Amino acid sequence: MNNDLIKNIDNIHTTELGKIRIKRNLNLQTENVVNYCKNEMKKSDNIYRKGKNWYIIYGEHIFTVNAHSYTLITAHMNKKNKNNV
């Protein structure tokens, strides 16, 4: 996928509260939340921008990244995919 988000994947970061929220929402055990999310994003072929945010859908996860600052805002389970599995 050739877009600005993937070109700037190394700039993606989050806040301490963001790490806590994402770990809780995705039920992650890893301490390196940002790298986990970046790796998942790189695998996605469903990336789109809507307004000021990028949305990345991969498997059961949906990631939201601010388009200007590349801050990973949140991640959560994709309820549609989860119910279809």
Label each residue range with its predicted role.
Residues 1-85:
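Ribonuclease/tRNase effector modules and their secretory precursors
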